[in-house]
Amino acid sequence: TPSFLRRIKDEEKKEMVEEYQRYLAEKGKRVQSFVKPKSEQGVPVLFGSDPEVNLVEYDSEGETKIVAGMIYNAPNSHRSWNETFRDVKRMRDEEKKKVVDAYLSGRTQRWQKVGRAFENAYARFEILVNIGAWRDIHRHRMLSQQRQNFSCFHGYDVPPEITESGIEGQFRSAIGRVEDIFSKIVKHDPDLAQYAVTLAHRLRFMQWENLRQSFWQIELRTIPEGHPDYRHLCQKKFLLLEKVYPLIAPYMRTN
């Protein structure tokens, strides 16, 4: 709740604030009855060591829209979007590439952001990764993210350092105790049960993003200094984008 609402002294207005808080807090519970039972949701992942990344939605005309966006606000452009888009649709791939080359000419560093033309195409990713990696990835704001509850339903990752240290058995034993506690709490309160989940457990979430944000996130999160978990995640995102946006993806400065 915004801090200025928490400072309200008027009792009637306080009640309005509380109603607003309940509205926000309980929206998930209001749709619980529409969710299929666990047995119908598919077989959970048991153990994992690599992020699972799927591209579930993209724009088949996305690259055409991006190129049209580049031309649309050129200093001498005064034609409508529909006219510009129609012209670009008639272009051959080589012609489109020349436009992109010109638009990005001089970009030599990842911190040199690509322009708003790249916001004309979107992609939706569904990701399964340990909560520790998600905590880094979810901080990106120029995209929409929806996560499911923290849980023990999707398995967990065993960091290689744990195995190398010879304590994998102890690690798995501790995880087992955590999962026993989780299974008892989740029957009564799925929200409260989230506090019993470790950062090693896997979380399923979605990212709905425009290609400008894809450039920023993938270029930043694949640098060699980054954590292997989110590096692998973003490398997989890049490989998926490369298949559906073959004109645009190669311009990403991916490691």
Residue ranges of model-derived segments:
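A conserved ligand/cofactor-binding region detector
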Residues: 1-255
